[in-house]
Structures are given as structure tokens and as C-alpha cells.
């Protein structure tokens, strides 16, 4: 009787309450820890400032960026990337979505102490701008090519990038969607080399989507007739992009092909920085996605060696790659090889 009374008094469970998000877990978004400190940064509610706060007290510590004080050519900031030394930041605006995780934007370099701001590059189509570990350089992708800059001089690392043919440093649609990432390059530990994945999708078949006025944001140019977006989309069983690995030596300006074995129809689903300047970690996977291998590759010689092999009965989840941690002497790897997700130390 008592249990029945409690159940009757409880809130009614219906479809609306289930789908409204009322039972979703609470979590914090929009904060970024500042490396080497006990602070985190966040964008103000009006988008006009980037502010630092104390983890211990939750109180505001400093205004790192202010649109008006910096005399920035923008009304608000949409995102930012702090430099590892905490002295500068990248801020971006005018972002436009490409696919689920990727976007193009106009980036600016802001010096926090001097309160000066300058454009990262010309145009509004820069992608995945990333600081080198020593905070001296920034790598980014524009028009499917990789560029590096120190804030004064811009160097174009690749020149063969072309829409629907060759992509450098960012994943094609399949990689972004299936492996849940939007940056396919990585600095080495001291910023003297940059490694990346190159996607040759010239032989992949094209798929076309119709575009309508009622999209968000509204596309008024399609009021009378729909538009069309055509891109390389390999259906199940069809050819994927042909992938290869490359590195760029910041001192010599030379590029080098990296020798990391992979099946003819296999994947390079991640490339990551390690604490060792002579090593990048490259992940490989077979087409069935049930066998993953990690290789340590030297960006200066191109040679590699296998360090981990992960095989599972069904398929390897993308969080295994995204949430693995590469340390100085060990690698922490999530795995559900026995049916349950555990952490394994190598």
C-alpha cells in the first residue's frame, strides 16, 4: 500500500517528459582550462569578452579579451584557442558549418598583454587553426591546403589541395562522420615538425544534395529553384579516399612521406602529438573496423614501428581513439574488448 501511494504521488512519466530532456544529466559546457594554471576561460554571455575564472573559487580573475578594448573588427567572438604559454589567443568569428563537426571561419591573433589584434590570414575560410606546442607558430587549413604562420610570415605547406579531389590536414566526409574528428594534422612536441593525413578523393563517386530556401540560416537565393551541393560520398562497399601520411620540417621547409603500413582499403583515423619530438602517434584501422594499430613514426625520417594492436569482436568505437592519452612512457587506452569499457595502460 505504501509503495502504491509513493508511485501515485510521483510525477507522471509520459512521452513529453522523456523527449524534453527533463531527465538528461547536468553538465558544464563552454569552459577551457588554461594550461599550467588553476584557471579556466569562458566566453561571456554577450560574446564580447573571454574571461578567466578560478577553479577553486569560481570567481572572475581577469578579462583576457574584450572586443571593444581590442578594437576588434567584430561584434562578438564565437570561439577562441589559447596559446600554450598563455600569452596569446586565437579568436574567430563568421563561422560557417561545413559538415557535422567542421567549420570555416575568420581567425584573428590577439596578444593579451599588448592588447593588439591582427588577422591570421586573408579571407573567412580558415579551418582548425592550431598553436604549435612552443606557441611560436600556428598551423591551419585553407582551401584544402595546410599553411603555417608566425603571425608575420605565412608559408603554404601544401599546394595540391582542391575541392572534391585532394584534402590536406582535415578529414573527408567519411572520416569526419565515422571517426568523429575534424583535424587531421598534429605538431610534434617542440613545434619543429608538422605531420598530416592527405586524402585523395578524386576517384570517389559524387553525391548531390538539393538545397532549399527553408534551411537554417535561410537561403533566399533558392526561393524559386533549389540549389545543389555535390561532394564525394562513398556508399557502403564503394571506394574510399586513398590516404597517405606526410610531414613538414619547419627548419628546412622540406616535406617527407611517412611509412606507416595500412591495408589498401584501410584507414588512418588519427594522428597525435607525443611528448617526444621525434615521434608522432598514428592510428591505423582495417575496413571492417575491428582491428586498430598504433604506430610511433619519426617525422624526420619517416620510419615507424608498431606499439599497440587492439582487436575486438565487433567494431572499435571512436571514443577509443579520441580519449586515449599519450604520455612520456605510457599510453592510456580505453577498450571494450571484453564487452565492457575499461582503461588499459601500455
Description of each model-found segment:
Residues 42-69, 97-100:
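Beta-propeller domains
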Residues 9-11:
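Boundary at the C-terminal end of the N-terminal hydrophobic targeting segment
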Residues 15, 21, 58-60, 94-99, ...:
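Predominantly five- to eight-bladed beta-propeller fold
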Amino acid at each position: 500500500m505504501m509503495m502504491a501511494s509513493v508511485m501515485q504521488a510521483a510525477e507522471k512519466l509520459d512521452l513529453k517528459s522523456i523527449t524534453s530532456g527533463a531527465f538528461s544529466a547536468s553538465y558544464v559546457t563552454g569552459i577551457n582550462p588554461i594550461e599550467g594554471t588553476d584557471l579556466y576561460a569562458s566566453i561571456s554571455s554577450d560574446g564580447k569578452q573571454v574571461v578567466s575564472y578560478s577553479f577553486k573559487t569560481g570567481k572572475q580573475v581577469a578579462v583576457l579579451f574584450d572586443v571593444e578594448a581590442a578594437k576588434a573588427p567584430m561584434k562578438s567572438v564565437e570561439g577562441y584557442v589559447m596559446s600554450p604559454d598563455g600569452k596569446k589567443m586565437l579568436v574567430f568569428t563568421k563561422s560557417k558549418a561545413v559538415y557535422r563537426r567542421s567549420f570555416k571561419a575568420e581567425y584573428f591573433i590577439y596578444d593579451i598583454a599588448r592588447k593588439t589584434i591582427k588577422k591570421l590570414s586573408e579571407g573567412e575560410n580558415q579551418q582548425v587553426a592550431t598553436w604549435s606546442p612552443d606557441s611560436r607558430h600556428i598551423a591551419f587549413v585553407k582551401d584544402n591546403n595546410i599553411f603555417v604562420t608566425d603571425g608575420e610570415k605565412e608559408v603554404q605547406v601544401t599546394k595540391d589541395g582542391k575541392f572534391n579531389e585532394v584534402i590536406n590536414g582535415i578529414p573527408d566526409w567519411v572520416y569526419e562522420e565515422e571517426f568523429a574528428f575534424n583535424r587531421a594534422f598534429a605538431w610534434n612536441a617542440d613545434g619543429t615538425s608538422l605531420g598530416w593525413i592527405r586524402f585523395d578523393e578524386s576517384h570517389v563517386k559524387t553525391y548531390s544534395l538539393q538545397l532549399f530556401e527553408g534551411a537554417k540560416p535561410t537561403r533566399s537565393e533558392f526561393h524559386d529553384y533549389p540549389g545543389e551541393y555535390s561532394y564525394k560520398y562513398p556508399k557502403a562497399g564503394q571506394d574510399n579516399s586513398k590516404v597517405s601520411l606526410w610531414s613538414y620540417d619547419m627548419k628546412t621547409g622540406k616535406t617527407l612521406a611517412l611509412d606507416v603500413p595500412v591495408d589498401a582499403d584501410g584507414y588512418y583515423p588519427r594522428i597525435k602529438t607525443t611528448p617526444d619530438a621525434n615521434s608522432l602517434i598514428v592510428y591505423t584501422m582495417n575496413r571492417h573496423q575491428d582491428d586498430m594499430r598504433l604506430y610511433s613514426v619519426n617525422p624526420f625520417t619517416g620510419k615507424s614501428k608498431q606499439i599497440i594492436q587492439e582487436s575486438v569482436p565487433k567494431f572499435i568505437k571512436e571514443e577509443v581513439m579520441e580519449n586515449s592519452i599519450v604520455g612520456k612512457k605510457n599510453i592510456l587506452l580505453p577498450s571494450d574488448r571484453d564487452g565492457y569499457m575499461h582503461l588499459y595502460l601500455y
